Structure formats: C-alpha cells, structure tokens
C-alpha cells in the first residue's frame, strides 16, 4: 500500500514537466515548425565532442539530405517513436557548438562502420538522443522563459505534490481505521470466550490472558460444573490463599464399577488463579464463597429439579489451538444465577460426600465409562453414566479438592434432545431427612379441588373447640373423595384404576361412560346383587326414583350390549380383562329385558307423584276461574273503570263502551293527573273506598268511639270510612290467590304431561306382554299387573278432569273478552300483574290518608263541622251525591 503514493508522485512529476514544456511552446502546433525555416547554408562543420554518440551511417545521412530537399520538414520537429520500415529522418539541429549530426564529409563518413541491421517492424525504436528529447536544450538564439512561466510551473508542481501527499495520508488513515475495526470485532469475542472459559472453570489449568500454558494440546478438565463461577458464593466457606506453591500431582483411583482414572491437580498459572486451588474451611461468620464440585451418589441417576435440564457438553474454541472445553451445566440456565432451590440441593448432596468436604468428582453426564477409549470413538448418550462410588478415599495433604480426569478423554458426544424435565428420583433418602412417611404418601395422592376457607391460628391462651378434635375420631374416605373431587388433568392418568390404560373395559364401553358408571356406583353405594334382586321381583320402592334414573342412564348401546353378552363367565373374575362398570352391566344384562324393567319401574315410582301434581294443577285452574267470575270486589273495580273510561272518552270513537279487555287494567297507572302524581287508578281506588267504607257497619270492635258515635264529627267519620273501605279494596289480592297460582302454569306443559302419563301405561303393558314368554318372571308380572289395574283407572279420571278444567278456562276467557284466546292462561297472568299494581296504589293512598288525618284534624272541633273532602265532588245535572257517599247516575248503577 505504501508504493501507491510514490508511484502516484512519480506520474504527477512526469506530467508536470511535460505540462510546463507545453506551456512554454503553447503557441505552436505539432504540424508547424518550431522555428521558421532558414534558407541559408548550414554552418561549417565542427568536430563532435568525444562524449557525443557516434554519427549515423552514410545511408542515413544521405537519406536525411534527400528528405530535406524534398519535404523540408521543420528543423526542430522531433519524433519520439519511429518505425523501422519507414523511419522519418531526424530533424537538423539548430546552430550549436556541438551539433548532433556531423557534416557530410566523405572521409568521416567512410571511417565509420556500417550500421547494425534494423529491428523487426513490430517493435518500436527509440532514437539515440532520447535524453535530449526529454530534456531539450535551447540554443543561444532562443528566447529564455519568462518569470511568469516559472512561477506557474512551481505552483502547479507544488499543488500536485500537496494533493498526492493528502491522498497518501487519506489512504493511510483508511487502512488504519479498517485494521482498528477488525481488531475490535475479533477481540470482544476472544475476550468473552476466554473470560467465560475462566469463569466456568472452578480450577483453572491455565489463564486465558495470554500467559504461558502448561500443555498446549491437553484439553481442560471436563467434569466441572458450569455454574461454579466466582459469582456464586456459599455460606460457611473461605479461600485459603497459602496454597500457591502446589505442583501438579497425579494419583490413580479406582471406581466401584471397575473404572480407573487419574486424579490430576494442575498448578496455578498465576497469582490470580491460585485461590481457585485453595482449601475450603469453615468460618465463624457466614461468608459466601464457591463450593467444590458436587460429589456423586451411589446411583447412576442424577437428581434434578423439574425446571432443570441436562446439557451434556459445551465447547469453547481458544484461538488457533482449537482446544475444546467441555462443561456440565443445566440447559436453559447457562449464565444465570442459580435458584435457591438448586443451592439447597447442593448443600444437601455435599453432606453425603465420600470425604466429608473438599472432594470432587466428574459430572454425571460427561463421565466416560472407559477411560482408555480411543479419540475416534464417538460416545452415545446411553453410554454416559456417573461414577458409582470410590473404593479409596481421595484427599490431598493440604485439603485441596481434586478432580477426576481421564488420561485422554474421547471426543464429546452429541447433545441429547432437550427435555422439559428429567424424571429421575433418588435411590435412597438423604441423610438427616426426617420427613414422615405420611408426607411422602401425600405427595403421591392426586390433586383435589380446593376448599377456600379462612384458617384460624391456634391459640395457647384460650380453650377452643378445635382442641377437642382427636386425630382418629374421623377417617376420610380417600377412594370416594378422590373419585368425586379430583381435578381433571388430561395429561395424567388416574391411579385408582377407574380408567386403566390397557384394560378390557376400553374395548366394550366408552372410557368416559365407564368412568361415569363407576362414579355412580360408588356414590349410590349399591351392589349389583341388590339391583338384580329388585329387578327380578319388580320392587320399585326398594331402589327409589334416583337410583332407577341413574341405572337408566347406564343403558348401553346395541353394539355394547352384544359385546358384553359375548363375554364368558370365566372372564368376570379377571380384573385385567373386565372393569367394575362392565361387571355391573353384564350382571344386569343377564336379566331378561333388564333396562325395560328399569324403565317400567321408574314409571311406577313416579306415577303417584305425577298424578297428584296434575290433579292439583287442575284444581287450581278450576278455583281460579271461579274466583274471577264470583269475586264482587273485582267486578266492582271493573265497573268503576268502565264508567270512568266512558266519561273520559266522551266525544270519541272509544266512548259508550260496554266492555273492555282486561289488558286495559294495566294502563290505568299510565294516565296521570294535573299534579303529576295522582293517576287514574288512584282516582278509581279513592272512589271505591268511599263506597265500600259506607257499606261496612260500625261495631264496637271496629271503632273506639262506640256509644259516642253521635258526638263525633263528620270529618272523623269520613276518615274512618275511607280507612275501612281501603281495607276492603286492598284485600282483593287475598281473594284471588288461586288466580296468581294459575298465572304461573303453562297450558301446553299440562297437556303434554297428561299425555305422557297415558303413554307410560302403554309401555308397562308392552313389558308385561314381552315377559310372558320368559320363565322365572312371575313375581315381576304380578307386581306389574297389580299396578296396571289401579293406574289405568287413575289415568282415566285425570284425563276427564283435565278436559273439564280446560273447558272452564275457555269459558272464563270468553266471559271477560267475548271470544277465545290463543293462550287461554293469559287472562290469569294479566290479573296477577294488575293485582300487584293495585297493592302498590293502595299503600300510597293509605299514606296520603294518614297525613291528612294528622295534619288537618282540629283539637276541638264542633259537632256540626264537616270535613273538606280530599277529592272535590263534581256535581253536574245528570249526577248527584248519594247519602251513602257513592256516585249515583240516572241509570242507578254504582
């Protein structure tokens, strides 16, 4: 790269010289003579200087003279390159003390030897005076260059040199930046790799900072934990820095499995790494320091948490040596701080170490079964196993932990596929594990649904009811509670044997159905023998409606029934071939028409209750129709609404009405008076309570004034009558109680239930007909026939009763509306809603009357004083106020 600027400098200088020369003769073209042609004779011959080159040959000289006479070229025109085939003659030199060509003297010409043969035509030739061509010398008569041309030449040369220098500096700067970036890109990876390698090794064989290595081609120890870096310190350990002068030691060891190895302790490479090989000892105060690698159990299966994973190898490449550093680390947690759970496991496992403390062994995943294996042999993950035990205790004199390393480890095996968790368990319990066996059993129990409650802390200062509970007073049925309240886990399989992975029950019944049947059998607490005996005798009272309904849900399909019937009797006792649900169903299928019997018995059990419900419903409907027709207060209310509505609709098409549908009763509260509070229903109720209060006779039990009736004022009499009339109107809801019940019924459901009862009798007859062909069914047929005689009679009575009630409902609908309704029970719903509104209005009117009594009653009122009515009485020509307080018209109504 440094030669480029110099080449550029040389080319620039060359062109600068030629440029200066061209500027000096800038006014002459190439085809014009440099000096005007002189016709005078050439100057006299002067002998050439000894330093000049020899003169050309006579042939060249004569050719030159001929060319001068014919073409007369310019005297100073120079041709730098010429061809051998037709070489142009060299131009004559101007008057000069040392001319380039000598005069044409025959003697001098003859003295020179003949010229050499010309070169080939393809190669150019250079004239002998190339130096004079590059650097021409002017004669004395030529005009010297002026000062302006010299200044321009110097300026141009300096500019070119400066530009070349700047370009050179820029090129050097670019090269420097590229090298710096290349170093920065390569150095972080190397530093990170070496730093990680040093941090991951608990005992460093040599530092990675460029210091001299002990062995260039020896791999670092493999069997170290990837997380025993300086960042992870543990309680109760301290580094002993006095063990810096240790030398590398080797001691053979033997494992229980016949595996031999060498314990190698490399010396520390620097003072910074000497602490890694120091002894760990107890301190009085807790201080966090790194622990030695974990010792191995007497089992080939390592123990890990559910969140940890195995990473069998890890390779780091160190510079040009390509040295592989293998470490053991849980996958997914490299470079992270270990969880407290992992630290606790390390402490527990360290207590079981062979030497007590300070011992070390290889990682379970990277330990090779054969230490003498060839490097070319590839180990599979299956062949990787941890050491079982050590026959001899391994310890150093100064307590420094050692590492178990093979003489020449084989190449690392390929990593196994990543797994979510390692289902490994310990072969024996840890020392000092005082956990109860009950706690171990609880861990194997299935998870149940959670009961959310508030726990009460035990108190030693007071006596509580919980103190009287004994541990053995109540035993939980584990089998039942697990069956009923177990949390459904689709990934796990049940441990109670209800649904077995490989069993005969999956070949006969659907697994879900089989599971449900088993749950029902446990919940009902009934055996197959009891059910079969009740089915044979036809005793429906023994089983009950709930059990019969559950049995009916267990009915298998035709295909399942055929499979269960094909089972041999020898297979019944084999729990591996048939499950509890299949056993129960097979026992039922041994009875002829078992599920038809169950259906018939369920009908018999429900028959009495169904008949009673339907008869009661029909009685309610019948009573409701009678209440609507015969309740005087309801009819009086309809009369008041009709007359009030005709009065309001005078002059319209809705006036002079003779009847209205009961739906109008619900619209009375929508019409409000001028005050915005009193509605049309309030007005009707006020008028009715006046009329009804006047009709109620006074008795001593009804009035506290008794004998002093004549002395009471008219105001008090009017308020008392309103109070009595309000009680009569508000009692309308109690008089129409059956109407409210009938409003909750559905005519379609009553009709369908009646038809279903009638169809059930037909099913019982069908079962009796089919069982007459079987043997051993006498007791069942006897039970069915006794019910059939009574049931047919009750069904006939129920159907006739239902028909009569439906006719009455239709009649009452026509009685109020004049025609039949699509929904015959709708009239009861309308009346029920109106009664709810009427009760609310009566309460509001009662509160208004009480405020009127306490706000308007004088302390001493004269006997002849009359009270002002709450509502003004409007008397027109066609109406008058009767003495009884009712509004009488000319027609005599109300």
Swiss-Prot record:
What superkingdom heads the lineage?
Eukaryota
Compositionally biased region (Polar residues): 298-310, 331-342, 351-377, 390-399
**Record key words, sorted:** Membrane, Signal, Transmembrane, Transmembrane helix
**Gene3D superfamilies in alphabetical order:** Formin, FH2 domain
Annotated membrane topology is: Single-pass membrane protein
Protein function: Might be involved in the organization and polarity of the actin cytoskeleton.
Q: Which PANTHER family match?
A: FORMIN-RELATED (PTHR23213), HISTONE H3-K79 METHYLTRANSFERASE (PTHR23213:SF368)
Q: What is this protein called?
A: Formin-like protein 2
């Amino acid at each position: 790269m440094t030669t480029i600027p110099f080449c550029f400098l040389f080319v620039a200088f060359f062109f600068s010289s030629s440029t200066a020369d061209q500027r000096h003769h800038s006014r002459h073209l190439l085809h014009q003579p440099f000096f005007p042609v002189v016709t005078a004779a050439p100057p006299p011959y002067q002998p050439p200087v000894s330093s000049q080159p020899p003169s050309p040959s006579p042939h060249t000289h004569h050719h030159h003279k001929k060319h001068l006479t014919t073409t007369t070229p310019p005297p100073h025109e120079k041709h730098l390159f010429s061809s051998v085939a037709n070489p142009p003659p060299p131009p004559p030199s101007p008057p000069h003390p040392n001319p380039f060509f000598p005069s044409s003297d025959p003697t001098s010409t003859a003295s020179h030897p003949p010229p050499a043969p010309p070169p080939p035509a393809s190669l150019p030739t250079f004239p002998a005076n190339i130096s004079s061509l590059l650097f021409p010398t002017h004669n004395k008569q030529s005009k010297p260059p002026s000062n302006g041309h010299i200044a321009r030449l110097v300026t141009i040369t300096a500019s070119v040199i400066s530009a070349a220098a700047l370009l050179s500096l820029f090129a050097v700067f670019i090269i420097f930046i590229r090298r710096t970036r290349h170093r920065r890109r390569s150095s972080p990876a190397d530093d990170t790799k070496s730093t990680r390698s040093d941090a991951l090794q608990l005992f460093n064989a040599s530092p990675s900072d460029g210091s001299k290595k002990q062995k260039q081609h020896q791999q670092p120890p493999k069997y170290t934990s990837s997380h025993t870096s300086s960042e992870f310190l543990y309680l109760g350990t301290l580094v002993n820095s006095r063990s810096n002068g240790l030398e590398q030691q080797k001691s053979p060891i033997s494992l229980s499995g016949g595996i031999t190895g060498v314990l190698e302790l490399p010396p520390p490479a620097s003072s910074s790494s000497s602490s890694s090989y120091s002894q760990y000892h107890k301190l009085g105060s807790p201080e966090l320091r790194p622990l030695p690698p974990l010792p191995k159990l007497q089992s080939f299966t390592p123990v890990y948490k559910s969140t940890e994973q195995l990473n069998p190898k890890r390779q780091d490449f160190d510079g040009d040596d390509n040295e592989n550093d293998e470490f053991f680390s849980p996958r997914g947690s490299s470079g992270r701080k270990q969880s407290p759970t992992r630290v606790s496991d390390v402490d527990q496992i360290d207590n079981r170490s062979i030497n007590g403390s300070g011992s070390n062994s290889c990682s379970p995943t990277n330990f090779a079964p054969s230490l003498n294996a060839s490097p070319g042999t590839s180990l599979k993950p299956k062949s990787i196993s941890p050491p079982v035990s050590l026959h001899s205790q391994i310890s150093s004199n100064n307590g420094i932990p050692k590492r178990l390393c093979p003489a020449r480890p084989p190449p690392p095996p390929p990593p196994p596929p990543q797994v979510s968790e390692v289902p490994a368990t310990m072969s024996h319990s840890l020392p000092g594990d005082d956990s109860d066996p009950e706690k171990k059993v609880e861990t194997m129990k299935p998870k149940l649904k959670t009961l959310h409650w508030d726990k009460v802390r035990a108190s030693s200062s007071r006596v509580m009811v919980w103190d009287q509970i004994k541990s053995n007073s109540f035993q939980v049925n584990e089998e039942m509670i697990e069956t009923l309240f177990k949390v459904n886990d689709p990934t796990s399989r049940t441990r109670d044997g209800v649904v077995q992975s490989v069993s005969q029950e999956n070949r006969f019944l659907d697994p879900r159905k089989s599971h449900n049947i088993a749950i029902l059998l446990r919940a009902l607490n009934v055996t197959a023998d009891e059910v079969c005996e009740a089915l044979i005798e036809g005793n429906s009272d023994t089983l009950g409606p709930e059990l019969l309904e559950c049995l009916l849900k267990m009915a298998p399909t035709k295909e399942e029934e055929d499979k269960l019937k094909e089972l041999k009797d020898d297979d019944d006792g084999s729990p591996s071939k048939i499950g509890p649900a299949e056993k129960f169903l097979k026992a039922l299928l041994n009875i002829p028409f078992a599920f038809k019997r169950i259906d018939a018995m369920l009908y018999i059990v429900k028959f009495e209750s169904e008949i009673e419900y339907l008869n009661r419903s029909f009685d309610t409907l019948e009573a409701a129709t009678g209440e609507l027709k015969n309740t005087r207060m309801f009819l009086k209310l309809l009369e008041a609404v009709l007359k009030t509505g005709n009065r309001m609709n005078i002059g319209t098409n809705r006036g002079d009405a003779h009847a209205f549908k009961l739906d109008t009763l619900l619209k009375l509260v929508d019409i409000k008076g001028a005050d915005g509070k009193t509605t049309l229903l309030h007005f009707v109720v006020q008028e009715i309570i006046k009329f009804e209060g006047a009709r109620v006779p006074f008795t001593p039990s009804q009035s506290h004034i008794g004998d002093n009736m004549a002395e009471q004022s008219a105001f008090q009499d009017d308020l008392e009558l309103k109070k009595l009339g309000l009680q009569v109107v508000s009692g309308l809801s109690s008089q129409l109680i059956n109407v409210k019940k009938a409003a909750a019924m559905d005519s379609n459901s009553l009709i369908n239930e009646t038809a279903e009862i009638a169809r059930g009798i037909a099913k019982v007859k069908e079962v009796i007909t089919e069982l007459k062909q079987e043997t051993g069914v006498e007791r069942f047929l006897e039970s069915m026939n006794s019910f059939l005689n009574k049931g047919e009679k009750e069904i006939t009575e129920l159907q006739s009763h239902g028909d009569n009630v439906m006719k009455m409902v239709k009649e009452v609908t026509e009685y109020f509306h004049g025609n039949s309704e699509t929904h015959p029970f709708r009239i009861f719903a309308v009346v029920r809603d109106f009664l709810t509104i009427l009760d609310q209005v009566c309460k509001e009117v009662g509160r208004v009357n009480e405020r009127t009594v306490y706000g308007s009653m004088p302390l001493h009122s004269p006997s002849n004083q009359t009270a002002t009515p709450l509502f003004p009485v409007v008397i027109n020509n066609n109406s008058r106020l009767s003495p009884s307080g009712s509004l009488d018209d000319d027609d005599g109504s109300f």
